[in-house]
Amino acid sequence: MSALPAGTAPPDAHYRYVLRLADTSLILGQRLSAWIGHAPALEEDLGLANLALDLIGQARLLLTYAAELEGRGRDEDALAFLRDAPEFSNLALAELPNGDFGQTIVRQWLLDAWQLEMYAALATSSDLRLAAIAGKALKETRYHYRFSSGWLLRLGDGTAESQARAQRALDDLWRFTSEFFTPDEIDTHMQTLGVAPALAPLAARWSQRIAADIAAATLRHPQTQPYPWHGKRGVHTEHLGHLLSEMQHLPRTYAGVQW
């Protein structure tokens, strides 16, 4: 992409756009799966596990479609397990460590609200395959958002300790949200084709939803200035490499192995 004139979409823009959606779900699902057996209570353990399974299921559908769009003979497993960190294009927020339960909930809530708007818009995409995937994912994401926003309310309007942890997580993670609705040449090109939605209306609805949830949870809206992260362009934090080294260990150690 760096060799192209500024603002010019690459020839494989469609593939890259679908891959971004896939990678965000895959990496977030991988992060959530680390809570299995470690959540504060059995109900939350099962809840987070179900969210992780849904996200990985979404990623599989999107990765399979991305592989077909790429047309290089790769499949969902090759895209998931045989790419290096700079080749991933997930939103940077998804790759951040789980931290405590409060940080996990705040991260999940921010991304659930984003996916809720994104999948609702993509369900009417001119790309019928992508629209079908988005329609299925939207049903799951509604549940994800109810789970995370419900827990945000409990934490924010709970004890002094839970509120402090939720507020700290919100302040720390807020700067990563600027990437959600900052369009680049791929977003713009896909929008002109009717594949992707315009991001400005989504940003307005997301902001309204987030502000209402923050107020309901008796939290303060962050004053942190957003930072222009570029996870969807392959620029990541150091945390993604550590996550991938664990996630990809078996396929890379035993190449081509079949169960």
Where does each model-flagged region fall?
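Internal, conserved structured core segments that host functional sites
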Residues: L93-F147
